[in-house]
C-alpha cells in the first residue's frame, strides 16, 4: 500500500460502518438485495414506488451509499481501505445503473447518485487489477440470483 489511512480517515470509516449496522438500514439493505431488480426507470418505479415502504428502503440504501461515496470522492476516506472493506456499494450501483439515466431525466438531476457512480467506476478498475474476473463473476452471480428470485415469486 502506497500510503496508510490517517487516524481521522479510519475513525470516519468506522463511523460510516457503524451507521450501516443500524437496524432500519440493515432491514432496507436486506430488502434491496432481495427485491430490487430493474432494467429501466419505469420498472424501478414499479418495484420501489415513491411514498411506499419499498421506496423508502430503496432511498435509504442509495442515499447511504451516495453519502459514503461522497466522503470517499472528497478524499475524507482512504480509497484502498474503503474498497477493501466496502464492496457492497458496487453491488448497489450495479443494481441502479440500468435505471439511473431515466431517473436523472425524470427528476431533472444530472448529478443524482453521481458520487456512487464515480466511486463504482474507480472500484471496477481497482478490483480488476487485483482480482481479474471478479466483476464478471459478480454480475453472473447477480443474474443467477435474479433468475432464482423470479422463479420463487
Where are these regions (language model features)?
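Acidic, Ser/Pro/Thr-rich low-complexity regulatory regions
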Residues: 1-153
Amino acid at each position: 500500500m502506497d500510503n496508510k489511512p490517517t487516524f481521522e480517515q479510519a475513525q470516519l470509516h468506522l463511523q460510516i460502518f457503524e451507521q450501516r449496522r443500524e437496524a432500519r438500514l440493515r432491514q432496507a439493505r436486506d430488502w434491496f438485495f432481495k427485491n430490487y431488480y430493474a432494467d429501466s426507470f419505469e420498472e424501478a418505479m414499479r418495484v420501489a414506488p415513491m411514498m411506499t415502504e419499498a421506496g423508502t428502503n430503496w432511498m435509504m440504501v442509495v442515499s447511504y451509499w451516495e453519502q459514503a461515496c461522497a466522503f470517499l470522492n472528497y478524499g475524507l476516506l482512504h480509497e484502498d481501505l474503503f474498497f477493501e472493506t466496502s464492496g457492497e456499494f458496487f453491488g448497489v450501483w450495479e443494481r441502479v445503473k440500468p435505471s439511473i439515466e431515466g431517473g436523472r431525466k425524470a427528476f431533472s438531476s444530472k448529478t443524482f447518485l453521481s458520487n456512487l457512480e464515480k466511486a463504482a467506476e474507480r472500484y471496477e478498475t481497482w478490483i480488476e487489477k487485483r482480482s481479474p474476473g471478479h466483476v464478471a463473476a459478480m454480475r453472473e452471480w447477480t443474474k443467477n440470483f435474479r433468475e432464482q428470485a423470479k422463479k420463487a415469486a
